[in-house]
Amino acid sequence: MSGNQYTEEVMEGVNWLKKHAENEAFSFVFKCDNVQLNGKDVRWNNYTKPIQNEELTSLIRGAQTAMDQTEEEEMDWESEVDSLAKKQVQTFDALIKKCLFEVFVSKNIEPNECVWFIQHEWGKDQGWHCHVLLHSKNLQQATGKWLRRQMNMYWSRWLVTLCSVNLTPTEKIKLREIAEDSEWVTILTYRHKQTKKDYVKMVHFGNMIAYYFLTKKKIVHMTKESGYFLSTDSGWKFNFMKYQDRQIVSTLYTEQMKPETVETTVTTAQETKRGRIQTKKEVSIKCTLRDLVSKRVTSPEDWMMLQPDSYIEMMAQPGGENLLKNTLEICTLTLARTKTAFELILEKADNTKLTNFDLANSRTCQIFRMHGWNWIKVCHAIACVLNRQGGKRNTVLFHGPASTGKSIIAQAIAQAVGNVGCYNAANVNFPFNDCTNKNLIWIEEAGNFGQQVNQFKAICSGQTIRIDQKGKGSKQIEPTPVIMTTNENITIVRIGCEERPEHTQPIRDRMLNIKLVCKLPGDFGLVDKEEWPLICAWLVKHGYESTMANYTHHWGKVPEWDENWAEPKIQEGINSPGCKDLETQAASNPQSQDQVLTPLTPDVVDLALEPWSTPDTPIAETANQQSNQLGVTHKDVQASPTWSEIEADLRAIFTSEQLEEDFRDDLD
């Protein structure tokens, strides 16, 4: 049917229910049991004592009008339902509304801010009872039990006031105690599986009315069937609505609120078992943990800076300090098991800066260039170790004199990783207490291993071992790359006053040996925190993957203790940045200037005036041929001019007579 075939009253009822369909409401039930006090029977319909209260009288009159208007001719209401029961229902309706109003006053809530629905029913077993749905934005789920106690108190007080049975003061007090102790006002609750406690259960206001209350029949024979007497609500939609219209409202609401598509899922027998209900605290901790892992939080200080709200929330809970510690431990464990140190560094790279990034001029590579090394090869080897691809050689060792750049490189790598554990030499019994669940172990200023040499060898080779922790049991250290700096020769192990040479070669087999001997100038500065992420991104972009297979493909073999980092040399073109630096250094060197002014011998004049050899062979091609033989690719070297092009440029500027005259002057 189309909407215009229904009455305006029906459509208003449907729209009102749809408006409050998803509003969460409390579900109360009022009842009045039959009791006996000192031989006096007090039945459910003995609460009609007249009282001089205009507000209560007005409410009773309104309920009477609603009941009279909704009576249908085919139902002989007057003959089947006695007038005493009818009058009692009207009185109860007024009392329940009075209780609601008194609760609103106690909570400083305006009545027009609340939505409520009341329906009086008769059950074969329960007898008379009344359902009350209450919704308000100012009422939270936690206040449900308090509301029940308040309504129970007001309900028992009004029942004693309107009881028509002649009771003594003591019996009135007893009646009120029975009403409160027996909970003549109840609220819908559910029992938690784990805590075994009852918690208030909220219902959807509109759905509950349409699917449950409006589908019930109107009571005709109190002794033969169950049904409803009267319904009232805050919107005045169902106070005067007939039974047939109520059925239409329920049907229309059900059709309009039906989902467009019905999703079907197939569950196994195991999945049919109801899972454990998670508490709000568990859900909050899981959400916090996901945020910490996504933001790579590995220390309490990082947590305070990046997630202060969740930190304060957990700290304020009972046992908050232990909760913080355990949550942070789960976060670091997740990072240590799912990410490598190289991956943590790589994800911090700013791709917008990678385009203009010059690897040769980075501070780390400047230190390597001072030693005449192939800086790409050194960075590639370090990246393989950080990615747990170094095999048994799981440790990067920076050693040499002071002020050569060992610590600033190690510090930059550790800061880029984030989840780093430090070796504590001062803690003799538990030196590796901070090294569990980490992506990198940093050993600063390592000395003689002594009694701990076997533990060092196991950790430096990437083995899984168990270590003792202070105040705890033993804990497992998974394969973790190590970065170590020292001024001493750590391959010499002394236990007491005795040297143990049998440990020298095993220690060397576990180290990526990088010996720095060139002292840095005082204004060299620190390595920028963005440098190593860009170095790793540069290596990946140019095909230097952090695997040992890729390393051997480029450099011919795996690194050794006495690895020659200067070979193969990087061949730079004339226009490359490296050559410009060399030219600048040569111009500022007095010795190189004296060599330029050295007189030329006569055979040099003839050599300069003759055509140069291999006129069609580019310099860059010759360099590339040499580099390809060594397994090195130079993608950043700019194209250099050929010898013939250089000769043509020189001869265009200087004639042969001018060149000969200049050379003669120098010889004289």
Swiss-Prot record:
Domain commentary: In the N-terminus, the endonuclease region is involved in binding to the origin of replication. In the middle, there are the ATPase and helicase activities. The C-terminus probably contains a transactivation domain.
Lineage: Viruses, Monodnaviria, Shotokuvirae, Cossaviricota, Quintoviricetes
Molecular function via GO: ATP binding; ATP hydrolysis activity; DNA binding; endonuclease activity; helicase activity; metal ion binding
Localization: Host nucleus
Protein residues bound to ATP: G400, P401, A402, S403, T404, G405, K406, S407
DNA-binding: annotated segments: 1-277
Cofactor requirement: Mg(2+)
Species the sequence originates in: Canine parvovirus type 2 (isolate Dog/United States/CPV-N/1978) (CPV-2)
GO BP annotation list: DNA replication; symbiont-mediated arrest of host cell cycle during G2/M transition; symbiont-mediated perturbation of host apoptosis; symbiont-mediated perturbation of host cell cycle G1/S transition checkpoint; viral DNA genome replication
GO CC annotations on file: host cell nucleus
UniProt entry keywords in alphabetical sequence: ATP-binding, Covalent protein-DNA linkage, DNA replication, DNA-binding, Endonuclease, G1/S host cell cycle checkpoint dysregulation by virus, Helicase, Host G2/M cell cycle arrest by virus, Host nucleus, Host-virus interaction, Hydrolase, Magnesium, Metal-binding, Modulation of host cell apoptosis by virus, Modulation of host cell cycle by virus, Nuclease, Nucleotide-binding, Transcription, Transcription regulation, Viral DNA replication, Viral genome packaging, Viral release from host cell
Binding-site list for a divalent metal cation: E121, H129, H131
PTM summary: Phosphorylated.
Keyword Nucleotide-binding: yes
PV NS1-Nuc domain residues: 21-260
Active site: Y212 (for nuclease activity)
Stretches the record annotates as Ori-binding: 193-197
Gene3D superfamilies assigned: 3.40.1310.20, P-loop containing nucleotide triphosphate hydrolases
Enzyme class: hydrolase
Protein name: Initiator protein NS1
SUPFAM superfamilies in the record: Origin of replication-binding domain, RBD-like, P-loop containing nucleoside triphosphate hydrolases
UniProt short sequence motif RCR-3, positions renumbered to this chain: 212-216
